[in-house]
Amino acid sequence: AIDVSLVGSEMCIRDSSGLDSSLKNGEFKLGVDLFSSEMNKGKHVISAILLKEGKSKGSRTVLDSTIKTKITDKQTIWFKKNIKNVYKWSAEEPNLYKLQVTLSDPFGKTLQSFTQQVGFRTIQINNGLLKVNGKPITIRGVNRHEWDPINGRAVTRASMVEDIKIMKRNNINAVRCSHYPNQEVWYELCNEYGLYVINEANIEAHGMRFHHNGYKQLTNDSTWSGQWIDRGQRMFERDKNQPSIIMWSMGNEAGDGKNFENLYKWLKYKDSSRPVVYEPASKKNHSDIAFPMYKDIKYLLKYAQSNKSKPLILCEYAHAMGNSVGNLKDYWDIIDRYELLQGGFIWDFADQTIEKENEDGDQFWAYGGDFDDQVYNNDSNFCANGLVAADRSPNPHFHEVKK
């Protein structure tokens, strides 16, 4: 099962921490939104403690601040502090701080308390390059579905840790959450172990390609605008404080139109610190990065030589189905030659097959057509595009990736 929690919160937090212009010092900036019908009964106390946890020397307190306030309506309380020579977060050096925020009533009773990770880092696009902490990065990424060979979409924390460790051991430094926001613990683990994350809104409309108006039927229909914003908003509000998330993706293969333009504006208004990307908008103003899929090497070469102002990152390439991924060296010879080409995400990480037993009692990996559904349409083995099998044993072409 997947955990689902509905919580009526009296306090929400917004961590906007980053680096100053020197890229050496941290700028801690925490907004605490308070709202409750009971907040007008005396002064409430909000405390914020920021700790740097060391492996050998224990925790060190960086911030310990308390604010007392009487709340008569929704209000935002700010905690700010400059931190000299801050430990910066990146995929290579995932330094984290621990934040504890507590709301107490006038009598000292704790009403709500949060603990979360804080990573100090900046994300910029300047001179046509995507930079983290002032340095251009190269994305050696994979697309990943949430998948378990026994439980399907219900994945455990232990399996997430295993996925991350496999990626890190094989020189993978980034993951695209295809094609929906993942469980919250996934981002916390990416913060901890060090993976760059592209978080993706659950907006997809493959089936509309069969409509006589195609994708534009929905993407330009204003009656669907609210649904577009809602899915982007839910992604952003839940995951906005995760330092591993360096980009927002508006969705996958859902065409393009006014609804995506509006979602782009909403996300940029709420968060100017991260790029927003979307594959069909790669050549338009509502994608900050060219984010194409399955473009050949000639396309990359032409783009790199055109002096474009946008960096290019392949959102999908090197489709890892069957005997495949043999052209990685050709791709990376070009990527390594041109700064404007900043990598890509292989499709995809793991086969989405499921363990099944045949009539002889032998276990096998089942896919479309193996579930007494031969009379129904299915995609056969098109769910088996992984660098690893469903049980995470490496497929032969995975060895090409580590090189």
Predicted regions and their residues:
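Single conserved hydrophobic/aromatic residue that forms the stacking wall/gate
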Residues: A1-G8, C12-I13
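Extended substrate-binding grooves/exosites of carbohydrate-active enzymes
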Residues: S9, T110-K403
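Short, solvent-exposed loop/linker segments at the N-terminal edge
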Residues: L19-G26
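Beta-strand-rich binding/interaction modules
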Residues: G26-K68, I77, L99
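Short glycine/proline/serine/threonine-rich loop/turn segments at secondary-structure transition edges
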Residues: M39-G42, N82-L96
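Beta-sandwich strand segments
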Residues: K57-R60, F107-F114
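Exposed aromatic-hydrophobic patches
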Residues: D73-K84
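Internal, hydrophobic beta-strand segments that form the core of beta-sheet-rich folds
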Residues: E93-D105
